[in-house]
Design a protein with these regions (language model features):
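C-terminal structural segment of proteins
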Residues: 1-285
Length: 285
């Protein structure tokens, strides 16, 4: 299909982008790589009156070391996340998950900010951001605002970004200590959305799990933390059997969708199995 008619602006600065977006109110949308928004436009599931193209704003691109955190620009592509040395050193699970996104064409165009601002629970990076305890940096006419990833995703395709706000970056805490990680994903084809995905981070100490963080993809209307499984894994031996037992509670508190790709019970089963695998791999078991 052909998208509905809209006005188009391509600002030359973030300030101009904020002004343009504010002028359009709730009927304006931001586009960067377009890998999430363009399909919705073509299907007329989204029909903004104004499209604000931030694809030329280099100030929104790149990775910076800012002490205990990395500041990642919203326009940083999946491909750049995969290959950035700072990301690989300090939050490698983000690179690992980005490498599973769709196909090379999408990874070269799609952006971190677009994936997060789109708010699709089937996307790979929202669950990773939640597991990492990332903070979203938004900018509007009132200035800059920071939003914890745990508070950012409100409902299906709905985030805490207010009308007129642009996601400019993501602050990701550096992993300090003996951390391992794994992103496990089940999908029908390489290009498909995740039926279920699991982002697991494990801090190891003397052969045991000192701390576990688990983010779930496509197990509800938003990305989720598997808090019951996290608690069960903490203090457990870093062995496959012990972590598989901890993973048995990974689906507690979830509300997975049912569709052509999997019934809710099937997704709950996948969450338990993939969590066990991800925890074991992250723990080096």
């Amino acid at each position: 299909m052909i998208p509905a008619k809209f006005d188009y602006v391509k600002p030359s600065s973030v300030g101009e982008a904020v002004q343009a977006l504010a002028s359009g109110g709730e009927d304006a949308k931001v586009i960067a790589g377009g890998q999430s928004l363009l399909p919705l436009l073509r299907l007329r599931l989204s029909y903004p009156d104004l499209l604000v193209d931030v694809g030329a704003l280099d100030e929104l691109r790149g990775v910076a070391d800012v002490g205990d955190e990395l500041l990642i620009g919203a326009r940083t592509t999946h491909y750049q996340l995969v290959h950035d040395p700072l990301v690989g050193e300090h939050c490698g699970i983000l690179a690992e998950a980005a490498a599973t996104v769709a196909d090379p064409a999408v990874r070269h165009r799609g952006t971190l900010g677009g994936s997060l601002a789109h708010g699709d629970p089937a996307g790979d990076l929202p669950a990773v951001a939640v597991a990492l305890g990332a903070t979203m940096v938004a900018r509007g006419l009132g200035g800059e605002r920071r939003i914890a990833a745990s508070d950012f995703f409100l409902d299906y395709l709905t985030t805490a970004l207010q009308p007129g706000e642009i996601l400019t970056g993501v602050r990701v805490p550096k992993l300090s200590g003996d951390w391992g990680y794994r992103y496990e994903k089940f999908h029908r084809t390489a290009q498909a959305w995740a039926t279920v995905g699991v982002a697991a981070l494990v801090r190891r100490s003397n052969g045991s799990v000192a701390e576990a963080r688990i983010g779930l993809t496509n197990m509800g209307p938003t990305p989720l933390r598997a808090t019951a499984a996290e608690s069960a894994a903490a203090g457990a031996q870093a062995s496959r059997d012990a972590l598989r037992t901890a993973a048995a509670s990974a689906d507690e508190g979830t509300n997975p969708p049912g569709d052509l790709h999997g019934a809710p019970d099937y997704r709950r089963h996948l969450a338990r199995v993939l969590t066990g695998r991800a925890l074991a791999a992250a723990a080096g078991a």
